[in-house]
Design a protein with these regions (language model features):
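Residue-identity detector for glutamine
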Residues: 12, 33, 42, 79, ...
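Amphipathic, charge-rich alpha-helical segments that serve as recognition/docking helices
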Residues: 1-60, 65-79, 87
Length: 227
């Protein structure tokens, strides 16, 4: 082992990264020289996703390794913000894990191509496979970017719908949207003649779900003027 007994995990990570660069990216050789297995090397290197403020806090023993492992998957600016709260309120590791899990987005709910998420530092799969502390596998820890990708996918789905309907509305949970479905028959039936007229109305259209669990679901034949 090349490190002092009191070397912090971050200092080990930084030293390992330098040795890995010297070895031209050969992780097996680097791990061998450090007296580690490759998993231990990968675990340490993943800590380098921590923002400088988080690294310093871990070096100074103001946070635990578990805190740093959980923060490593967040965008750097969010790491800084969350770190301040962790230190100020002495937030335990388990509480932080629960809080971060509430903001993460499930990749299984995504309607965009998640192939781009493989290897992303914000994909919790990396932390789940290597760290003792993580929010679990299959989550995006960069919710604003996830939302951007979701909206881009929804916009793409809306293009052909706009050729069919005067109104195409994205529906979010906070909208409290209650659709008014119209048709020629059924409980809200208006008759064939009126329904034909409705389809030409500027308030006739469809909704496209922007809500987790139903992303991309389309509800057609809606009236957006219930007055």
């Amino acid at each position: 082992n090349h490190f002092r007994d009191d070397t912090s995990d971050v200092e080990q990570a930084e030293g390992a990264a330098s040795l890995l660069a010297y070895n031209k990216g050969d992780k097996h050789e680097t791990a061998l020289q450090l007296g580690w297995n490759v998993d231990t090397l990968e675990r340490r290197l993943l800590l380098l996703n921590c923002a400088p403020t988080v690294r310093s806090a871990l070096n100074e023993r103001r946070i635990k390794l578990g805190h740093a492992e959980l923060l490593a998957g967040l965008p750097a600016n969010r790491q800084d913000k969350v770190l301040g709260g962790v230190i100020e309120h002495k937030v335990p590791v388990e509480v932080l894990k629960k809080q971060l899990g509430q903001f993460a987005k499930r990749l299984s709910d995504a309607i965009f191509d998640t192939a781009q998420c493989i290897g992303c530092p914000h994909n919790s799969a990396q932390q789940a496979s290597l760290f003792d502390e993580s929010i679990g596998d299959g989550f995006c820890q960069h919710p604003s970017h996830y939302d951007e990708l979701t909206m881009a996918a929804l916009e793409a789905r809306a293009v052909p719908l706009r050729d069919q309907f005067p109104v195409v509305r994205f529906v979010r949970l906070e909208d409290g949207f209650a659709p008014l479905t119209v048709g020629p028959d059924g409980p809200m039936g208006v008759g064939a003649t009126q329904y034909t007229a409705c389809k030409g109305c500027e308030n006739f259209g469809c909704s496209l779900s922007a809500m987790a669990g139903s992303y991309g679901e389309v509800h057609e034949s809606l009236c957006f003027d219930a007055a």
